[in-house]
């Protein structure tokens, strides 16, 4: 858990296995990834509640489902989504709740989530690969495809060496763009 005071105040805490409600799933976390956003939360640069469980990206397995859950079965492989309350369209402030920021995150063995807070993992990806996709991969996709409207044959400048840049490089190349 994060504690006011930054990285040197992080704590490992033992807790009981969480209980779920009717519309929730219990996920055993297989892998999680650290993004720049997570670092900012841990450093206190992004204000959050004291004792927040960090990390917003993960992969895992559904190990229990609530009575009214219809989308998932025990054993399903899932990955996190950056903004679980934002389904489509332009983001609105009320949809921008971020797991690991305004809600407890994936730096845990088990997490309880609404059934709508996750999506299926891509086929052929390992749990570790999947855990890198939600924030960095989708940020790169949004920048290049949704906002940038990148087409084959166009040239794109990709700056940086972090997760978003690496995904942007791979996406641009796979789309037939020239990367500088």
Predicted regions and their residues:
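Extracellular beta-rich ligand/substrate-recognition surface
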Residues: 1-9
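Glycine-rich beta-strand-centered segment in the early N-terminal region that forms part
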Residues: 16-32, 42-87, 102, 122-125
């Amino acid at each position: 858990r994060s504690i006011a005071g930054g990285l040197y105040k992080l704590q490992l805490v033992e807790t009981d296995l969480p209980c779920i409600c009717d519309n929730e799933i219990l996920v055993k976390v297989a892998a999680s990834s650290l993004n720049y956003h997570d670092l900012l939360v841990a450093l206190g640069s992004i204000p959050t509640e004291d004792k927040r469980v960090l990390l917003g990206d993960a992969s895992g397995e559904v190990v229990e489902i609530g009575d009214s859950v219809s989308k998932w079965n025990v054993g399903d492989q899932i990955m996190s989504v950056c903004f679980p309350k934002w389904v489509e369209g332009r983001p609105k402030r009320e949809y921008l709740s971020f797991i690991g920021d305004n809600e407890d995150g994936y730096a845990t063995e088990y997490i309880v989530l609404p059934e709508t807070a996750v999506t299926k993992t891509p086929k052929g990806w390992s749990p570790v690969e999947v855990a890198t996709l939600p924030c960095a991969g989708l940020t790169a996709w949004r920048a290049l495809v949704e906002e940038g409207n990148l087409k084959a044959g166009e040239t794109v400048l990709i700056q940086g060496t972090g997760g978003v840049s690496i995904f942007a490089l791979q996406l641009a190349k796979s789309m037939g763009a020239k990367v500088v």
